[in-house]
Each structure stands twice: as C-alpha cells, then as structure tokens.
C-alpha cells in the first residue's frame, strides 16, 4: 500500500498546494498527516503564504480525506473548519505486513509504549527528517512540509512495500531512501 506521509504544514497555502500537486503525481492510497496542520505556533515564524482558510479549503476538497493525528499546534477550533477528523493523538495503520503507529511527536513516549517489537512509529513535531532503530522499533520522521529545521528540505515521505522515500515537496526529487528490515 502506497502512503504519502507529511507533517507540519502550519497553514502554508504555498506548501500545502505543492504537497497536493505531488499527491496528484504520486497517487497514494492515502495521505497521512502527522499534525500541526493549520496554525503556525508561537515558536515558529510565519510560513510562506500563511493562509489557514485556503489551506483548510484545499485539504477539505480532497476526494479522499487524509488520515490525521493531532499536533501540539492543532486544536478544537481547527477541527471546526476541517471536514476530516484531526483530534486523535494516535492512530495505527496496517500496511504491507507492518504496523505503523502515527503520532505528532510531542507524545512520542506514549506511542513508543504501544508499539510492539518491529513496529514503526511515524512522527513529526521536530521538523527534522529522521530514520532510526531503537528498542526494537523504527522511528521515522518525514520532516516538515513548510518550516524545515536544521538545514533540512521542505519534504514529505512515501511508504511502499517496506521502503520509506523522502522527497522534496517543491521538486519531487528523491533525496533519501531507507528500507525496513524484518
């Protein structure tokens, strides 16, 4: 199952539109959003073309609703303008024989406790792409669509058949690939 995974859009209409253009090209079975969808948060500068209403309208117009988890910048007011569930702190996806736990990252310890050995924990929050194995689990972060940190790219990630592929949201260029070993 091909999943398109992104995090930390933070209300950037420019980068949300770029992500949705990539989605047209990628044709995933599902778009997974790991939180911080509309609000930029008090610690972040305003992202390019900050327009929460436009961002919400683009996401609401999707033919298939994205699967989302709540980020630390997401709240009940955001849910009032989005037509798909946003307020779950955790979710799980079963794909290609793997269990993928979804969380934003500010509750990463709780998600780690729920994961069985060999499971994959997907998280955002740090705005920094990551792929690491610890305590028998994989921890994978797509980075940020709109406000990347530590010199990383504006990015999203694909999952298909045990492989994660990171891509630049503006160009679609592949810049990292990692395989899960069972």
Summary of predicted features, one role per range:
Residues 2, 27-30, 53-54, 64, ...:
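Context-gated lysine
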